């Protein structure tokens, strides 16, 4: 399991009270009752935990938890590829 997946899962279960069994790969954010306000809170929590910044444009591409995790993993990879890291 990637660190991004673990952190996102931990935030969703801990802060947003989403049950792990509900976080199936095909479940949409709407299936999990994650609305636009919750997405903003989720972005902030993930950003603080992993030190990544996610734009509103990137958020509009999310439909499932794997979409969210893929965005976070890409951000982490991009950050680690920067000179001086």
Regions found by a protein language model. Give the residues of each.
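Phosphopantetheine-dependent thiolation modules in NRPS/PKS and related acyl-activating systems
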Residues: 1-32, 38-43, 48-85
């Amino acid at each position: 399991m990637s660190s991004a997946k673990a952190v996102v899962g931990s935030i969703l279960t801990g802060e947003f009270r989403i049950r792990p069994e509900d976080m199936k790969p095909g479940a949409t954010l709407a299936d999990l009752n994650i609305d636009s306000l919750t997405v903003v809170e989720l972005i902030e929590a993930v950003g603080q935990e992993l030190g990544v910044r996610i734009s509103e444009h990137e958020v509009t591409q999310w439909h499932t938890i794997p979409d969210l995790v893929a965005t976070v993993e890409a951000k982490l990879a991009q950050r680690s590829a920067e000179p001086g890291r």
